[in-house]
């Protein structure tokens, strides 16, 4: 998910005779090639989950849903059947004159364990399209950076649960010379806070439930980045309704979330982040001293040392008001962008060249090669998925909120603790290569929260996140196995840190994100097994 603005082998010498006696060593010509090897370790078994394209009958097709039906064999550039799905605009109220509508794309699952649930996915921004999540993170087909065509996604969340990707509220623009805005959702700006966003989303979702006969289904709400506000506020609003026929919310999960003030999430942990990934930030001694001096002078160094502790010593004090002289995050971004002009704030291990992205945004900034088109801006694509024929952009540069200001408090202050109390499981996950929002900022936020009768975690997250080994499958959808992170749970809140993972967890670490979803849904009870 984009958003939060547009910002980043050594070989041992071996004696030839000794090498000859070691049959497992490879020649230099063989470096990079993988030999198949048997593993006596836990494995994923996908055999019980039939591919979505094998569906013989449409499970949700009826008179009410027919207008939303998508022909899974006629998605432009997709050379396989994506299966049963429904897409289009749904109004946010039952008013006959309602002009505000949210765009959705709904995929029923073939997994029998999913029959009594629905999972909602929201991207963030604010002002970024959830179709990015569908196409490049966790949908049934993927078209990722630098690839020629869409491919089937073996880690599609539709293999586990019924999924609906919903584009957040987006204002239309009366100026025809400018893009209509993010995604396909329609309406003039009217939201001033997350409470307003939640109210409108619940209006949409009630209509969605009525249309697809999903009454009483357990609801899981998942999102990333600025959805660290959307998800808990929407869940809180659903709990407050006390109406399980329409709003039977079960649990929530947020990836790399915006849950606190920017100073905590970005400025305070910036210099320790650079130190941890020193090889990716090859600064000279002069600049390294400069950013350390900035962090010391602005109180960031002492703040980290004193408050990122387990258990916490008490409520975290407010930081002094931010000044340009204390903007160490931007100083680092500007400096590393000189060394690595393709620096990606969403995944800091990225280097040049910039890869082609069919959504036009392959890193810290927009980029589309000459002659290329943004996929969802194509008329044939829009017709195939029941979208309005209009200009589509992945992220809007125009304000989503009235006057460009979200008047809500950060979700970690009050809303997330309330949601944790009312849910069987709440998960906060964070990629360790994310610079746009830094994992230690999320941990600081958790250590400042009070829920379940205590503040923060009593222990630092340290348990291994284990992903079962699996067949490599297609080279186009490789994903890791083994220990891919660390995790910790206390009082129904689970924190997961994903190793070698950027801002968009399901994009950069699909197998681990799939595993975490299994835990959220209650399909597994231990992330270390």
UniProtKB/Swiss-Prot annotation:
One Pfam family this sequence matches: Peptidase_S10
Domain of life: Eukaryota
Protein keywords: Carboxypeptidase, Glycoprotein, Hydrolase, Protease, Secreted, Signal
Signal peptide positions on this chain: 1-19
EC code(s) of this entry: 3.4.16.-
GO CC, alphabetical: extracellular region
Known function: Removes acidic, neutral and basic amino acids as well as proline from the C-terminal position.
Protein name per UniProt: Probable serine carboxypeptidase ARB_06414
């Amino acid at each position: 998910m984009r958003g939060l603005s547009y910002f980043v082998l050594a070989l041992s010498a071996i004696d030839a005779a000794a090498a000859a006696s070691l049959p497992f060593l490879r020649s230099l010509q063989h470096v990079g090639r993988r030999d198949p090897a048997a593993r006596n370790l836990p494995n994923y078994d996908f055999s019980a989950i039939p591919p979505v394209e094998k569906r013989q009958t449409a499970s949700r097709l009826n008179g009410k849903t027919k207008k939303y039906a998508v022909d899974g064999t006629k998605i432009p550039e997709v050379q396989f059947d994506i299966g049963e799905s429904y897409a289009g605009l749904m109004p946010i109220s039952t008013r006959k004159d309602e002009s505000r509508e949210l765009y959705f794309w709904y995929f029923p699952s073939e997994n029998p364990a999913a029959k009594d649930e629905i999972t909602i996915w929201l991207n963030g921004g604010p002002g970024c399209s959830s179709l990015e999540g569908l196409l490049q993170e966790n949908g049934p087909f993927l078209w990722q950076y630098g690839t020629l065509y869409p491919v089937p996604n073996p880690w599609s969340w539709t293999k586990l649960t019924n999924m609906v990707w919903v584009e957040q509220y987006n204002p239309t623009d009366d100026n025809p010379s400018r893009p209509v805005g993010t995604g396909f959702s329609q309406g003039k700006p009217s939201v001033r806070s997350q409470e307003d966003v939640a109210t409108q989303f619940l209006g949409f979702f009630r209509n969605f439930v009525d249309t697809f006969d999903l009454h009483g289904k357990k609801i899981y709400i998942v999102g990333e980045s600025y959805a660290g506000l959307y998800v808990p506020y929407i869940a809180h609003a659903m709990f407050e309704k006390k109406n399980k026929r329409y709003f039977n919310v079960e649990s929530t999960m947020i990836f790399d979330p915006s849950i606190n003030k920017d100073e905590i999430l970005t400025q305070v942990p910036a210099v320790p982040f650079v130190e941890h990934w020193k090889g990716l930030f090859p600064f000279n001694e002069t600049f390294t001293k400069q950013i350390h001096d900035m962090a010391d002078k602005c109180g960031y160094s002492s703040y980290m040392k004193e408050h990122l502790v387990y258990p916490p010593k008490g409520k975290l004090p407010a930081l002094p008001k931010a000044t340009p002289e204390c903007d160490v995050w931007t100083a680092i971004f500007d400096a590393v962008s000189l060394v690595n002009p393709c620096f990606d704030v969403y995944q800091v291990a990225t280097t040049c060249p910039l890869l082609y992205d069919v959504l036009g945004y392959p890193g810290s900034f927009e980029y589309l090669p000459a002659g290329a088109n943004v996929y969802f801006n194509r008329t044939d694509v829009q017709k195939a998925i029941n979208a309005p024929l209009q200009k589509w952009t992945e992220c809007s540069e125009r304000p989503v909120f009235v006057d460009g200001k979200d008047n809500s408090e950060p979700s970690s202050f009050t809303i997330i603790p309330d949601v944790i109390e009312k849910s069987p499981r709440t998960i906060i996950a964070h990629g360790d290569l994310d610079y746009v929002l830094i994992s230690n900022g999320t941990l600081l936020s958790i250590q400042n929260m009070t829920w379940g009768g205590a503040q923060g975690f009593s222990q630092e997250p340290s348990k291994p996140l284990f992903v079962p080994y699996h067949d490599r499958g297609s080279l186009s959808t490789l994903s890791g196995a083994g220990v891919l992170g660390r995790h910790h749970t206390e009082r129904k809140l689970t924190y997961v840190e994903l190793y070698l993972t950027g801002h968009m967890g399901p994009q950069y670490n699909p197998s681990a994100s799939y595993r975490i979803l299994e835990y959220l849904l209650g399909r597994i009870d231990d992330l270390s097994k």
